Amino acid sequence: MVTPVCNSSTWQPKDSSFLSWPEMFSLDSFRKDRTQHRQRQCKLPPPRLPPMCVNPAPGGTITRASRDLLKEFPQPKNLLNSVIGRALGISHAKDKLVYVHTNGPKKKKVTLHIKWPKSVEVEGYGSKKIDAERQAAAAACQLFKGWGLLGPRNELFDAAKYRVLADRFGSPADSWWRPEPTMPPTSWRQLNPENIRPGGPAGLSRSLGREEEEDEEEELEEGTIDVTEFLSMTQQDSHNPLRDSRGGSFEMTDDDSAIRALTQFPLPKNLLAKVIQIATSSSTAKNLMQFHTVGTKTKLATLTLLWPCPMTFVAKGRRKAEAENKAAALACKKLKSLGLVDRNNEPLTHAMYNLASLRELGETQRRPCTIQVPEPILRKIEAFLSHYPVDSSWISPELRLQSDDILPLGKDSGPLSDPITGKPYMPLSEAEEVRLSQSLLELWRRRGPIWQEAPQLPVDPHRDTILSAIEQHPVVVISGDTGCGKTTRIPQLLLERYVTEGRGARCNVIITQPRRISAVSVAQRVSHELGPSLRRNVGFQVRLESKPPARGGALLFCTVGILLRKLQSNPSLEGVSHVIVDEVHERDVNTDFLLILLKGLQRLNPALRLVLMSATGDNERFSRYFGGCPVIKVPGFMYPVKEHYLEDILAKLGKHQYPHRHRHHESEDECALDLDLVTDLVLHIDARGEPGGILCFLPGWQEIKGVQQRLQEALGMHESKYLILPVHSNIPMMDQKAIFQQPPLGVRKIVLATNIAETSITVNDIVHVVDSGLHKEERYDLKTKVSCLETVWVSRANVIQRRGRAGRCQSGFAYHLFPRSRLEKMVPFQVPEILRTPLENLVLQAKIHMPEKTAVEFLSKAVDSPNIKAVDEAVILLQEIGVLDQREYLTTLGQRLAHISTDPRLAKAIVLAAIFRCLHPLLVVVSCLTRDPFSSSLQNRAEVDKVKALLSHDSGSDHLAFVRAVAGWEEVLRWQDRTSRENYLEENLLYAPSLRFIHGLIKQFSENIYEAFLVGKPSDCTLPSAQCNEYSEEEELVKGVLMAGLYPNLIQVRQGKVTRQGKFKPNSVTYRTKSGNILLHKSTINREATRLRSRWLTYFMAVKSNGSVFVRDSSQVHPLAVLLLTDGDVHIRDDGRRATISLSDSDLLRLEGDSRTVRLLREFRRALGRMVERSLRSELAALPLSVQQEHGQLLALLAELLRGPCGSFDMRKTADD
């Protein structure tokens, strides 16, 4: 066991049991500090404003019923901030909007000082500060609207128009944001010029543009940095004004000097108060700034200033105020000479006044964490290394071995796989082909022609044209309008042509669909139309579910991902006659990747025919991509659909103006869906609309659950008369199929779906379509290297597709929750996914299919080539995690990962878990990161977070909470007690369909691991007694292996931060990654943890939201796990007695110990690397018994090391900041 200690003292074990733990890293003081800071109120005297105050009513304030104002301006602070920010080209308007608070006996008063476009003040009242602020801000919004700074619907103008409007007030906008020179010491404005400007009482007024309550988390502020980063930005300024200050008495006999000082500092008392309050974090300066005035005709004022050190200033005047102002001005002059006031005569930031404390804390942060390994464990490590020495010439391979030495693994070296059946491929003999073709012809004759038994579709008259084009050309594009029948009919037409010509056995068609539900439902529809005799010739294959057709005369419907997997084991698609790529216009990343492979496949298999089918889109572009192939256009048929837009809908609902969110859309293009409006519309349709199903398109799962809950609450006891069906990729296929079922008589079907229901599937009884106009799109930020799943407007092509869902089988109605003007602004087609998402998976797939080409070369052949920089970033990441070598060839690790169908980092974690013998919990974690097991919604997030915290116990891990949740579910399933199962799900807020899906994923990953030669048989993966699960109960090892897979996704918790206002908060924490600071999302249990066992966290994914980067899942990891299990080299500094060891590629981990301990840990790390290398180079289960025993001893030592305490994070309890 080991004890890392992060201060000068070290922890000594009391006895051999090592059961005592050091003091945990406590966050209690941080929470208390934050609360106390918000409870204080700044009582500075209000700044003296020019006499340009607006007095529209007697009394000098703008008065109007707050209820009416807030109804017109529901988010007034955001609106004010947006107007000024846009007009001045700044991101924050704090120095243009100053809120001054006054406590009344019953209500709080706020005076809002507005400094742009001219100086004016308004007042607001409320029981809370935030209410008073909002009322004042709403009054200011009314004033802005009267000045013409807001449109009739409170919409914003562009920046150019604001500059013109500002000129009318005599305050050109440009003059307000031109950078101003400042003097050393470096101010926060210099450190973050885009966010902060000097001139305001830093930290005294709340951030504008936020409507939250007083307890809003301060960590959410943009621009917050940790102490180390702040000091590195100010290191060029060695001047510490507080150290240079000296006390003294200044008897002023020369009144001219005082007059000149007063001219330089016209409001000296205010300035002194602000400086002292900011520097000392106090709400008043009275105790540190005291006046004593004597005299009758001539007043003599003595100012005693106790900060930064005792100083006295004396001045005279005819009146008391004059004398005191002169003394204060002299004090201001002295402070400026000490560097305590900037060149604009404004206070410095709180951080700059506390540089000494910052530097002291920074020095503490830079000290390495001291580790002590108990002597018994050190002796065991020495004995192991003596018995199994690591060759001195052996260097950590970083899992990046040159591919020249790699043993071929997997199916690529074996027989081809039949793409239709999945069995080993063997061509049919001539006799078998004749016999099978004759049998198919007899079955077909009994059935009769398609058009005699199935309803006539618009595509049927074009039958000969389509079939002739496919016969004569290797590639054909079919552009068919919605409802033409291309998806179900063209595969049957191909099969009919081949069968009736006596060559049916040669017809083997693979039809790809973009989604699982489409592949299954279309296969079932075609199977039904072909009839009982030919039903076995139609099949489907999707993730976790497969029903392949019989060989010869086969139609296989599958997802694009399934076909990509088939191409790995049969690169030329031998045995396939046609590939039909349906819905190619959607331009998902897998389809674009598939087109690259299919284009190259034409040389390998010239007989293969490729058909691209699209409902909408730039079909000529596909034609040019395939060398000018023919495009056949097929008109569709739709019943009439009556369309309603937002303005029509609001009129029907009796609402006479846009909801605020929709007004905001018009000005800011932001996409926030009003779930209440959606619910009201569905209820209105139900009450007054035609009978029939309602299909509602929503952006994502949270919106689906939100609308579902609102409908259930509104329907109450009448819910039995409605069938409310959510449709989302999170829901297993067996549950999604319910949307195709006809509801009982008198029951209305309401389908709540994402764009999963937009194409390929037809729900016959849908009459009404509610279109939110929104969907989720993944976008990748090259600068932050973070993905963001954003809600964005759909394209016009999407709107057409959604509208078409209402007119497939009867006349219908489409309700668009956006104005007609928005439709005109929508882009014609979606941006291809390949241009806006991370490319690691795609690059890995490229290296599997065409290893001889570089990633850039391969992806440059796409219909739309991605940004070269994005491709290079993906290659670098894969090299960092050891999947590719420097020549872009797959490493041994990369070859193993190629078998596992998930994100490369998660796949790496699975591979390492098999080697480190803790496989099952990692399979659960990876499955749960793919599909969330909890039944979370907008309404119950807090409850879900509490359940996760309980499930995690004291592990400090969201990921182990997943493991315990699934383990509990598996245990309940064994009881076969329905009541127990339901109680378990309800108590732990788990979603049964997701748990079933997770179970399927674990089964699939088990097959993948078997294919990668990591286990002897798939069932071993979940068997507790199997060798691959020997250490599955060792939680620190499990978390460490997960971290090794996810590395460099590592966080170091650091003490102290500097806010964007320049406020130094020594008792707060920041979360530092290799690429910068991030925030912990409320959904991770470590966000609200009061004690952390370790300063180091690992995470899978960071997401960007509102300009900040958040981590949603995290696990505390042992510092020795970080040292021993990560890739890359380590760096050691050894003076012969003490040594430090750190990661060469990161400054997030530095450990210190005696030279012997550090040397042994380095050798132990190399032994672990050797174990991984050996395991990757051969079948894991086939390793010699002696090697397996060696690995077993090594892992036993590692588990013992990690059972020890993770170390304490000794926090200095400073005064409240």
Swiss-Prot record:
<dbReference type="InterPro" id="IPR007502">
    <property type="entry name" value="Helicase-assoc_dom"/>
</dbReference>
<comment type="similarity">
    <text>Belongs to the DEAD box helicase family. DEAH subfamily.</text>
</comment>
<keyword id="KW-0690">Ribosome biogenesis</keyword>
<comment type="subunit">
    <text>Identified in a complex with TFAM and SSBP1. Interacts (via N-terminus) with ZC3HAV1 (via N-terminal domain) in an RNA-independent manner. Found in a complex with GRSF1, DDX28, FASTKD2 and FASTKD5.</text>
</comment>
<feature type="compositionally biased region" description="Acidic residues">
    <location>
        <begin position="211"/>
        <end position="223"/>
    </location>
</feature>
<feature type="domain" description="Helicase C-terminal">
    <location>
        <begin position="677"/>
        <end position="850"/>
    </location>
</feature>
<dbReference type="GO" id="GO:0003724">
    <property type="term" value="F:RNA helicase activity"/>
</dbReference>
<feature type="domain" description="DRBM">
    <location>
        <begin position="76"/>
        <end position="144"/>
    </location>
</feature>
<dbReference type="GO" id="GO:0035770">
    <property type="term" value="C:ribonucleoprotein granule"/>
</dbReference>
<keyword id="KW-0547">Nucleotide-binding</keyword>
<dbReference type="InterPro" id="IPR014001">
    <property type="entry name" value="Helicase_ATP-bd"/>
</dbReference>
<dbReference type="Pfam" id="PF21010">
    <property type="entry name" value="HA2_C"/>
</dbReference>
<dbReference type="Pfam" id="PF24995">
    <property type="entry name" value="DSRM_2"/>
</dbReference>
<dbReference type="Pfam" id="PF00270">
    <property type="entry name" value="DEAD"/>
</dbReference>
<protein>
    <recommendedName>
        <fullName>ATP-dependent RNA helicase DHX30</fullName>
        <ecNumber>3.6.4.13</ecNumber>
    </recommendedName>
</protein>
<feature type="short sequence motif" description="DEAH box">
    <location>
        <begin position="582"/>
        <end position="585"/>
    </location>
</feature>
<dbReference type="GO" id="GO:0016887">
    <property type="term" value="F:ATP hydrolysis activity"/>
</dbReference>
<dbReference type="GO" id="GO:0042645">
    <property type="term" value="C:mitochondrial nucleoid"/>
</dbReference>
<dbReference type="InterPro" id="IPR011545">
    <property type="entry name" value="DEAD/DEAH_box_helicase_dom"/>
</dbReference>
<feature type="region of interest" description="Disordered">
    <location>
        <begin position="176"/>
        <end position="223"/>
    </location>
</feature>
<feature type="domain" description="Helicase ATP-binding">
    <location>
        <begin position="467"/>
        <end position="635"/>
    </location>
</feature>
<keyword id="KW-0496">Mitochondrion</keyword>
<feature type="modified residue" description="Phosphoserine">
    <location>
        <position position="403"/>
    </location>
</feature>
<feature type="modified residue" description="Phosphoserine">
    <location>
        <position position="29"/>
    </location>
</feature>
<keyword id="KW-0347">Helicase</keyword>
<dbReference type="InterPro" id="IPR056755">
    <property type="entry name" value="DSRM_2"/>
</dbReference>
<keyword id="KW-0067">ATP-binding</keyword>
<dbReference type="GO" id="GO:0003723">
    <property type="term" value="F:RNA binding"/>
</dbReference>
<feature type="binding site">
    <location>
        <begin position="480"/>
        <end position="487"/>
    </location>
    <ligand>
        <name>ATP</name>
    </ligand>
</feature>
<dbReference type="Pfam" id="PF07717">
    <property type="entry name" value="OB_NTP_bind"/>
</dbReference>
<feature type="modified residue" description="Phosphoserine">
    <location>
        <position position="249"/>
    </location>
</feature>
<keyword id="KW-0694">RNA-binding</keyword>
<keyword id="KW-0963">Cytoplasm</keyword>
<keyword id="KW-0378">Hydrolase</keyword>
<dbReference type="InterPro" id="IPR002464">
    <property type="entry name" value="DNA/RNA_helicase_DEAH_CS"/>
</dbReference>
<dbReference type="GO" id="GO:0003725">
    <property type="term" value="F:double-stranded RNA binding"/>
</dbReference>
<keyword id="KW-1135">Mitochondrion nucleoid</keyword>
<dbReference type="GO" id="GO:1902775">
    <property type="term" value="P:mitochondrial large ribosomal subunit assembly"/>
</dbReference>
<dbReference type="GO" id="GO:0005524">
    <property type="term" value="F:ATP binding"/>
</dbReference>
<dbReference type="GO" id="GO:0005739">
    <property type="term" value="C:mitochondrion"/>
</dbReference>
<dbReference type="GO" id="GO:0005829">
    <property type="term" value="C:cytosol"/>
</dbReference>
<dbReference type="Pfam" id="PF00271">
    <property type="entry name" value="Helicase_C"/>
</dbReference>
